[in-house]
């Protein structure tokens, strides 16, 4: 595979979506963080180079950093009792290539069903399922490209819908200076079957990011720019900042701040006239990375009364 051809394909695919994309999208569970490490760094990170299979959900190019024959399990508690769970398995293929398969499940729980008059007629449930295959390829000693193809189904009561999406990722990593730079186009695609006659758009997200370890010390900073095809809100709200404190090769602490989440979750304080985010947008996490076993956990604040916990565990056979 030629590096220039892959990069051109990535940029052309992203630009085609820009023309028709708006803010009304479906399958928004695909926006949620799967990786606890990424969740701890503000919910969006596409540049951290680690032996962490869950990061592949954020950038398929990062699959090349994952050990052969790795099984990864993830779980997240979300707002209003919703939960997500998933699993992935990755292995090294032919020269410079790595493969992976994954599945994600989101359960929104049971909800009250009413008729047009508002009378309760029973209960219904809602859930989303996604299955995917990922391929990454080392284009050179520093460039890696990756692609994820995904089939998605969604259920609300007796109704269902289906969609296909593709993630494209490109990563540049300079190990001598510990620079990592990535460009990712997430959720390119469309709906195959709708709930009704009106089809919804996929939650496309064009992202760019950088990570840098400072002076070979314990600190690594990350900055990710998201939703780069929509500029109808403040530029700073496109940014997600993260900090890793690498205590040893096996242990890290992480913290992040999501500017958009903090702004959107602001509420009026009863004490004064100022709005308060009540720590919305703040996230924290930690990880244990042994040779064969990995464990990651993250806490993220979404609202004064809502937070999420994300767990990842992985084992290399």
PLM regions and their residue ranges:
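Sec/Tat signal peptide C-region and signal peptidase I cleavage site
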Residues: 16-20
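Positively charged n-region of N-terminal signal peptides that target proteins for export
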Residues: 1-5, 141
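Subset of outer-membrane beta-barrel
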Residues: 21-317
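Sec-dependent N-terminal signal peptides
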Residues: 4-14
């Amino acid at each position: 595979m030629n590096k220039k051809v892959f990069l051109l394909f990535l940029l052309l695919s992203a630009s085609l979506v820009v023309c028709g994309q708006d803010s009304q999208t479906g399958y928004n569970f695909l926006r949620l963080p799967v990786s606890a490490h990424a969740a701890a760094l503000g919910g969006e990170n596409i540049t951290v180079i680690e032996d962490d299979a869950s990061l592949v959900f954020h950038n398929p190019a990062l699959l090349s950093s994952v050990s052969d024959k790795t099984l990864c399990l993830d779980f997240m508690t979300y707002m209003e009792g919703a939960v997500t769970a998933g699993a992935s398995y990755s292995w090294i293929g032919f020269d410079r290539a790595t493969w992976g398969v994954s599945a994600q499940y989101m359960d929104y729980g049971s909800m009250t069903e009413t008729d047009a008059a508002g009378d309760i007629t029973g209960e219904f449930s809602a859930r989303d399922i996604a299955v995917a295959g990922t391929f990454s390829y080392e284009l050179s000693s520093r460039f890696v490209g990756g692609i994820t193809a995904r089939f998605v189904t969604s259920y609300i009561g007796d109704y269902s819908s289906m969609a296909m999406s593709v993630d494209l990722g490109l990563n540049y990593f300079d190990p001598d200076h510990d620079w990592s730079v990535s460009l990712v186009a997430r959720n390119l695609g469309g709906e195959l079957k709708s709930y009704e006659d009106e089809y919804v758009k996929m939650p496309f997200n064009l992202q760019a990011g950088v990570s840098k370890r400072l002076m070979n010390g314990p600190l690594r900073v990350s900055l990710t720019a998201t939703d780069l095809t929509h500029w109808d809100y403040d530029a700073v709200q496109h940014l997600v900042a993260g900090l890793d404190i690498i205590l040893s090769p096996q242990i890290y602490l992480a913290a992040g701040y999501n500017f958009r989440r903090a702004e959107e979750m602001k509420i009026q304080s009863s004490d004064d006239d100022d709005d308060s985010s009540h720590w919305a947008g703040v996230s924290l996490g930690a990880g244990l990375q042994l040779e064969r076993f990995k464990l990651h956990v993250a806490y993220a604040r979404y609202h004064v009364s809502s937070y999420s916990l994300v767990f990842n565990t992985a084992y290399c056979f």
